[in-house]
From Swiss-Prot:
Gene Ontology annotations of biological process type: ribosomal small subunit biogenesis; translation
SMART domains, A to Z: Ribosomal_S4 (SM01390), S4 (SM00363)
Organism for this UniProt entry: Pseudomonas putida (strain W619)
Name this protein carries in UniProt: Small ribosomal subunit protein uS4
Domain S4 RNA-binding, residue spans: 96-156
Upper lineage: Bacteria, Pseudomonadati, Pseudomonadota, Gammaproteobacteria, Pseudomonadales
Length: 206
């Protein structure tokens, strides 16, 4: 499956919630009617079956983290093989992706932009360049913007935006040095309550 490159607003409207695919400079509601599904019949949201509800939740999470279907299934299988709650394991694996950590640290204004920074070799982990967005960051890893990329305007603007909205507690960032430490894997209670990972587990358990 190819990566979606169309309007980000359309994806948020499809899921009926803000997927944080935009930078957040303006409120999403000012430019995107997320209460209505995309298309000419968007005002009509029909009743969903249990399967439909489970599928929509899976699509929502997959789109939030920018993961393709095959990758997402792989994450689920890895989560199911680990000890603990499969749904929580799944979210933690997604949170440990390098592109997501770059976003959480504020070096990219969106996960999509953060993924591009990683792919373009603008990011290092423990002093070594890593250009794999799916790279799993571990507690204690130092993630930084490489010196040759540190003056990019989009990175400077992303850090300013992050300072306004605040950072998550599981990263410690020195904005001046454009470097941060991934302190720990977030617990389920630290992550979005708007995600019902149990629906995803039910979907893949069929």
């Amino acid at each position: 499956m190819a990566r979606y490159i169309g309007p980000k607003c359309k994806l948020s409207r499809r899921e009926g919630t803000d997927l944080f695919l935009k930078s957040g400079v303006r409120a999403l509601e000012s430019k995107c009617n997320i209460e209505a599904a995309p298309g000419i019949h968007g005002q009509r949201r029909g009743r969903q079956s249990d399967y439909g509800t489970q599928l929509r939740e899976k699509q929502k999470v997959r789109r939030i983290y920018g993961v393709l279907e095959r990758q997402f299934r792989g994450y689920y299988q890895a989560a199911a093989s680990k000890k603990g709650a499969t749904g929580e394991n799944l979210l933690q694996l997604l949170e440990c992706r390098l592109d997501n950590v770059v976003y959480r640290m504020g070096f990219g204004s969106t996960r999509s932009e953060s993924r591009q920074l990683v792919s373009h070799k603008a990011i290092s982990v423990n002093g070594k360049t890593v250009n794999i967005p799916s790279y799993q960051v571990r507690p204690g890893d130092v993630v930084a913007v490489r010196e040759k990329s540190s003056n990019q305007l989009r990175i400077v603007q992303a850090l300013e935006l992050c300072a306004q909205r605040g950072r998550v507690e599981w990263v410690d960032v020195d904005s001046a040095k454009k470097s941060g430490v991934f302190k720990n894997v977030p617990a389920r209670g630290d992550l979005s309550a708007d995600i019902n990972e149990n629906l995803i587990v039910e979907l893949y358990s069929k």
